[in-house]
């Protein structure tokens, strides 16, 4: 049976939680406290989007994701800045229950089988904005992806 969940989103940019992927207005300087607030207010999950631009920013974001995972009693889903299998590993080791592959990026589609076999289908999620990717990559999604996230 398909199930819909209330998933709160945190967009990390330069150490803060910002409004969304395009608007970097700061909504919280303490993303872990924001995540705890969401958890205490009936979120089924928290999705964290790492918007870092450099390796140093990415490592700092992973430290924040660790704090978020510790602050939450619900699963944390890690997304953003995935370029290779190592990035999925880092998200999972930071405490994320699952990691997201962005199906708007060919490089993420190309590593689907590899990361699913390495970490297990249950740990891998795909995000998409264009529904045509669902039919275009149907077999890959069914075999190697546990969940889908529609980004709109």
Task: Show where each model-derived region lies.
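Short, glycine-/small-residue-rich phosphate/pyrophosphate-handling segment
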Residues: 106, 118, 127
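Conserved phosphate/oxyanion-binding catalytic-loop motifs
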Residues: 78
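Short, well-ordered alpha-helices that flank and scaffold nucleotide-derived cofactor binding pockets
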Residues: 70, 93, 117
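C-terminal helical cap(s) of enzyme catalytic domains, especially alpha/beta-barrels
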Residues: 110-119
């Amino acid at each position: 049976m398909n199930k819909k969940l209330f998933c709160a989103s945190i967009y990390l940019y330069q150490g803060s939680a910002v409004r969304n992927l395009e608007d970097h207005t700061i909504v919280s300087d303490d993303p872990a406290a924001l995540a705890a607030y969401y958890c205490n207010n009936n979120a089924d999950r928290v999705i964290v989007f790492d918007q870092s631009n450099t390796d140093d920013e990415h490592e700092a974001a992973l430290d924040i994701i660790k704090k978020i995972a510790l602050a939450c009693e619900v699963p944390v889903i890690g997304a953003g800045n995935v370029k290779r299998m190592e990035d999925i590993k880092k998200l999972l080791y930071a405490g994320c229950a699952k990691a997201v592959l962005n199906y708007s990026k060919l490089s993420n589609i190309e590593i689907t089988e590899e990361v699913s076999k390495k970490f297990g289908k249950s740990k891998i999620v795909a995000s998409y904005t264009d529904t045509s990717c669902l039919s275009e990559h149907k077999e890959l999604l069914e075999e190697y992806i546990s969940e889908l996230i529609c980004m709109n």
